[in-house]
Amino acid sequence: MEAQLSAIEELVAEEINGIALAPYNDSRIRDKINLLSEQGIPVVTLNTDIENTRRIAYVGSHYTKSGSTAAGLLRLMTHGEVHVGIITGSSNILCHTERIAGFTESLKPFSDTIHIAEIVEVHDDEFESYEKTTVLLKRHPEINALYFVAGGVYGGCRSVKALGLQNQMRIVAYDMVPTTKELLRQGIISAVICQQPKLQGSKPLALLFTYLTTGELPDREQHYVAVDIRIRENCD
């Protein structure tokens, strides 16, 4: 978080005209965005949003909906008693908490058969994910499904393989990075939810360009990308 504040300060010192930012969900970042607005520097948030700021737009996933989608996928691919381990990045990242909220809310009507065993934070770190997933699965041997909310997918799946649990585990993750794609091909991961990363990268710049050249605000604040579900058969 300190690194993000420092990066913003460096950009302001270079007299930039606008910022596209994936914000850390912290009051200091919130205050900084509002200060930038007062200084006439527009901000577009991408990939994850932050509440109660004067950013001109957000481009990214509808995270509660993507969490609900993950819950729906899990229901379709499991039967009987299901015990889910949730592996997230950080409770200080809004998109991570919103995904979990959408996921758990959608599973409430099925709480007699689908249970949340535990939620662990791995801070998008593969080594931390490997270690904490190993501890999680040993502490809860009943877990037969994993929901990866953010990064750390490769490390967590390496743990599943090391424990020999790949054939009894259903795994849902996000974003088709090369390692995740390979795990999907191998059948370790059951489904991946993708979020149009190229659009998330290009749209904020287009919105900033239009605002800076014409003075026109975006026609809406939220620009949600489509939810794209991939399984082994359509991962290429």
Regions of interest found by a model, annotated:
Residues A3, S66-A70, L94-T113, E128, ...:
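Short, solvent-exposed amphipathic alpha-helices that sit
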Residues S91, L107, Q196-D236:
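Hinge/cleft segment of the Venus flytrap/periplasmic-binding protein
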Residues I56-A57, H83-S91:
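Short beta-strand segments enriched in small/hydrophobic residues
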Residues R28-K65, V177-R185:
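Flexible loop/hinge segments that line or gate small-molecule binding clefts
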Residues V59-V84, S129-Y130, T180, Q196-T213:
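Hydrophobic alpha-helical segments within soluble ligand-binding/sensing domains
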Residues I8, N17-L35, F103, E121-T179:
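Hydrophobic alpha-helical
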